[in-house]
C-alpha cells in the first residue's frame, strides 16, 4: 500500500552557484559517496541537483526533521548486465532506517534531469505481511 508520495524539482543552476560560491557547503548537504559519484562527471551539478531533489522529496514524505546527510542516494554496482550501476535508491541513517523497518516501509526513488532542471520522486510503500500459503 502506498503511504505517501513526495516530489521535488530544482534548477540545476542553483546547485551550480552553490558549488561555485560555497564549496564547503557541499559537504554539509551531500555524503562523501554522493560527492565522489558526481565528481566523476565533467559537470557534477546535474547529479548533485538530482540528489538534492531526492532529499527534498523524501522530506515531503517523512514529516520529521533530519539532517541533510541522514538521507542519501546510492547506487550499487552490478557485476552483470548492460549498465554498470543499478537503479538509484535511498540510503538512511540508522534512526530513519530503524523506523522505516519497524513500520514495514520501503522507499522507492526515481531521478531525472534536463539541462536546466533536476527532479526526484519518492514513493513510500508499506509492505503488507502475507500469510504463508
From Swiss-Prot:
<keyword id="KW-0276">Fatty acid metabolism</keyword>
<dbReference type="GO" id="GO:0006633">
    <property type="term" value="P:fatty acid biosynthetic process"/>
</dbReference>
<keyword id="KW-0460">Magnesium</keyword>
<keyword id="KW-0444">Lipid biosynthesis</keyword>
<keyword id="KW-0479">Metal-binding</keyword>
<dbReference type="GO" id="GO:0000287">
    <property type="term" value="F:magnesium ion binding"/>
</dbReference>
<dbReference type="InterPro" id="IPR002582">
    <property type="entry name" value="ACPS"/>
</dbReference>
<feature type="binding site">
    <location>
        <position position="8"/>
    </location>
    <ligand>
        <name>Mg(2+)</name>
    </ligand>
</feature>
<dbReference type="InterPro" id="IPR037143">
    <property type="entry name" value="4-PPantetheinyl_Trfase_dom_sf"/>
</dbReference>
<dbReference type="InterPro" id="IPR004568">
    <property type="entry name" value="Ppantetheine-prot_Trfase_dom"/>
</dbReference>
<dbReference type="GO" id="GO:0005737">
    <property type="term" value="C:cytoplasm"/>
</dbReference>
<protein>
    <recommendedName>
        <fullName>Holo-[acyl-carrier-protein] synthase</fullName>
        <ecNumber>2.7.8.7</ecNumber>
    </recommendedName>
</protein>
<feature type="binding site">
    <location>
        <position position="56"/>
    </location>
    <ligand>
        <name>Mg(2+)</name>
    </ligand>
</feature>
<dbReference type="InterPro" id="IPR008278">
    <property type="entry name" value="4-PPantetheinyl_Trfase_dom"/>
</dbReference>
<keyword id="KW-0808">Transferase</keyword>
<keyword id="KW-0963">Cytoplasm</keyword>
<dbReference type="Pfam" id="PF01648">
    <property type="entry name" value="ACPS"/>
</dbReference>
<comment type="function">
    <text>Transfers the 4'-phosphopantetheine moiety from coenzyme A to a Ser of acyl-carrier-protein.</text>
</comment>
<comment type="similarity">
    <text>Belongs to the P-Pant transferase superfamily. AcpS family.</text>
</comment>
<keyword id="KW-0443">Lipid metabolism</keyword>
<dbReference type="GO" id="GO:0008897">
    <property type="term" value="F:holo-[acyl-carrier-protein] synthase activity"/>
</dbReference>
<keyword id="KW-0275">Fatty acid biosynthesis</keyword>
Amino acid at each position: 500500500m502506498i503511504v505517501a508520495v513526495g516530489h521535488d524539482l530544482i534548477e540545476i543552476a542553483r546547485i551550480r552557484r552553490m558549488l561555485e560560491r560555497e564549496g564547503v557547503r557541499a559537504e554539509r548537504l551531500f555524503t562523501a559517496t554522493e560527492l565522489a559519484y558526481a565528481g566523476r562527471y565533467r559537470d557534477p551539478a546535474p547529479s548533485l541537483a538530482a540528489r538534492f531533489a531526492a532529499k527534498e522529496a523524501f522530506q515531503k514524505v517523512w514529516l520529521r526533521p533530519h539532517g541533510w546527510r541522514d538521507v542519501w542516494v546510492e547506487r550499487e554496482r552490478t557485476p552483470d548486465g548492460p549498465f554498470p550501476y543499478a537503479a538509484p535508491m535511498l540510503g538512511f541513517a540508522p534512526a530513519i532506517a530503524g523506523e522505516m523497518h519497524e513500520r514495514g516501509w520501503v522507499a522507492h526513488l526515481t531521478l531525472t534531469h534536463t539541462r536546466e532542471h533536476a527532479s526526484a520522486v519518492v514513493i513510500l510503500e508499506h509492505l503488507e505481511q502475507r500469510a504463508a500459503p
